[in-house]
């Protein structure tokens, strides 16, 4: 008994020392249980520095994921004959395995960054914060997407356990924030080692020159090396730190394109957003899982899309149907058209930048949990299914420590020619998760937007915890006198507040965007 009391005493001292118990860890019981588990394998836990403890937690979590994957696969084989929806289970299993591999990759990269000599400058800190946030996003995506049934009942408790562990890791990480370290002021952060090197292929402002030096060419008329986009992507090297450019000539490419996370630093460049078109019509009505409906899904870090169209033609009656899903860190979409209806653009996770794009849809047509900034984009609401309202954003930040949010800056928010603004209401956003974070700044807002501006997801959920902001917008829809009265919504007056949602602050863009050679505005 004395041994147990002493162990628990040491545990509580440890938690106080590392600043987790009171200030950083919301789930106290999970923190205690997990740290007890770690204590069993470490006789000197109370003496370990916070960063070292976090590394232990992450390594432990990677091992846990391996155990969970093996257990789920074995369990699924044993119960396969009991499943009523084998096709759905196969789809769920594929998604589960993809998400688990993604989380392992992010945790391993986080450990490497924590062990690196640059930590904790601002650049390396934001890298780890991004990746650990994305781990939680992947787990939550699994729970959201896996269909109801025996498979989900077996998997969900394991996912809940992984979520608790990921939240503990994130809480530990927050406790070693460098923001109070004055020594960091003079540090110039660097891009992570896997981000592409700057060479002659990175002169993106000269699109014609870039096409001429592309690694491969795709053409419907036979003038390129490949006739399909997928064939060209298959030819790209794996785990490359050098940029691989694919030029896709004018044409309509009817195919489902998936860029795996083993193919970083990939550029797709077309002849223009009205000339090079990748299209499909998958929707939740025939594919079941929104995550898998994307016409183009990019999971690779450092992805860049230029001068092309990503289209989903499923239509307003088919439910969620993604045109473009982006799940890779430090991704850029430049001068592209994203065209769909519900959930048209899915910035799923990690850091993303959209510049001079045309984005059109209906319900939640910019949705996800990425850290994403949209600059100089045309955001166009179109006619939805009868009885529906349009909602532009559905940002899904689930926990306060997660690093995510959307900024719409210097964009035009308007109606398509087919939208009946007299009968269809359009809103700037609604909270997919309770800490949903969106800022609309310095933009033109047309009269299509309802005077309330924002709409609830369900009842009062998240209205006091969300972070919805507006700043210096103009146009008939920008009048804020009749906006919602939620405590989580604010009209910003102070430019210092608005600065927190800029490329430099929200996206940490100065550490990586300049390497892409895509134009951007760092501040207001």
From Swiss-Prot:
Q: Where in the cell is it found?
A: Secreted, Cell wall
* Disulfide feature: 357-377
Where does the record place the catalytic residues? 343, 364
Locate the region Pectinesterase inhibitor 19: 23-172
Q: Where is this region: Pectinesterase 19?
A: 215-510
Please give the residues the UniProt entry marks as glycosylated: 265, 281, 412
- What is the tissue specificity? Expressed in siliques, but not in flower buds.
Chain positions of site Transition state stabilizer:
342
Keywords from the named record:
Aspartyl esterase, Cell wall, Cell wall biogenesis/degradation, Disulfide bond, Glycoprotein, Hydrolase, Secreted, Signal
GO MF annotation list? enzyme inhibitor activity; pectinesterase activity
Any idea which positions bind substrate? 290, 430, 432
Q: Which SMART domains match?
A: PMEI
What CDD domains does the record point to? Answer: PMEI-like_4
Query: What pathway is this protein a component of?
Result: Glycan metabolism; pectin degradation; 2-dehydro-3-deoxy-D-gluconate from pectin: step 1/5
What family does this chain come from, according to its entry? In the N-terminal section; belongs to the PMEI family.
Q: What is this protein called?
A: Probable pectinesterase/pectinesterase inhibitor 19
Task: Give the originating organism.
Answer: Arabidopsis thaliana (Mouse-ear cress)
Kindly list the organism's lineage.
Answer: Eukaryota, Viridiplantae, Streptophyta, Embryophyta, Tracheophyta
Name of the encoding gene: PME19
């Amino acid at each position: 008994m004395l041994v147990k009391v002493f162990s628990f005493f040491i545990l509580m001292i440890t938690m106080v020392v590392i600043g987790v118990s009171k200030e950083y860890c919301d789930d106290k019981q999970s923190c205690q249980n997990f740290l007890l588990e770690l204590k069993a394998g470490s006789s000197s836990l109370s003496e370990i520095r916070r960063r070292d403890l976090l590394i232990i937690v992450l390594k432990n979590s990677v091992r846990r994921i391996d155990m969970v994957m093996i257990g789920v696969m074995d369990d699924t084989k044993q119960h396969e004959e009991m499943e009523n929806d084998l096709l759905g289970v196969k789809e769920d299993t594929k998604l589960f395995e993809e998400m688990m591999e993604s989380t392992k990759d992010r945790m391993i990269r986080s450990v490497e960054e924590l062990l690196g000599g640059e930590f904790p400058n601002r650049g390396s800190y934001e890298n780890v914060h991004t990746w650990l946030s994305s781990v939680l996003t992947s787990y939550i995506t699994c729970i959201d997407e896996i269909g109801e049934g025996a498979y989900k009942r077996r998997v969900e408790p394991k996912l809940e356990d992984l979520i608790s562990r990921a939240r503990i890791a994130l809480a530990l990480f927050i406790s070693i924030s460098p923001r109070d370290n004055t020594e960091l002021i003079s540090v110039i952060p660097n891009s992570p080692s896997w981000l592409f090197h700057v060479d002659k292929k990175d002169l993106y402002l000269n699109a014609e020159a870039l096409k001429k030096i592309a690694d491969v060419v795709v053409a419907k008329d036979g003038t390129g090396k490949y006739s399909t986009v997928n064939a060209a992507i298959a030819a790209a090297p794996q785990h490359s730190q050098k940029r691989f450019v694919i030029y896709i000539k004018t044409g309509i490419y009817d195919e489902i394109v998936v860029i795996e996370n083993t193919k970083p630093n990939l550029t797709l460049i077309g002849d223009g957003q009205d000339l090079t078109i990748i299209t499909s019509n998958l929707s939740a009505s025939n594919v079941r899982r929104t995550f898998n409906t994307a016409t183009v899904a990019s999971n690779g870090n450092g992805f860049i899309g230029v001068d092309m169209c990503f289209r989903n033609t499923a239509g307003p009656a088919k439910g969620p149907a993604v045109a473009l899903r982006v799940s890779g860190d430090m991704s850029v979409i430049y001068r592209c058209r994203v065209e769909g209806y519900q959930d048209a653009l899915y910035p799923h996770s990690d850091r993303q930048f959209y510049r001079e794009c045309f984005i059109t849809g209906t319900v939640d047509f910019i949705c996800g949990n990425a850290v994403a900034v949209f600059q100089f984009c045309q955001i166009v609401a179109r006619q939805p299914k009868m009885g529906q309202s349009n909602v532009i954003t559905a940002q899904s930040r689930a926990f306060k420590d997660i690093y995510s949010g959307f900024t719409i800056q210097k964009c035009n928010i308007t109606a398509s020619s087919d939208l009946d603004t007299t009968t269809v209401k359009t809103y700037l956003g609604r909270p997919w998760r309770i800490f949903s974070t969106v800022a609309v700044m310095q933009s033109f807002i047309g009269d299509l937007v309802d005077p309330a501006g924002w709409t609830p997801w369900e009842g009062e959920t998240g209205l006091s915890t969300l972070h919805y902001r507006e700043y210096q917008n103009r146009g008939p829809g920008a009048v804020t006198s009749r906006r919602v009265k939620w405590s989580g919504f604010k009209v910003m007056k102070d430019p210092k507040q608005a600065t927190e949602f800029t490329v430099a602050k929200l996206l940490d863009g100065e550490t990586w965007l300049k390497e892409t050679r895509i134009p951007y505005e760092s501040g207001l």
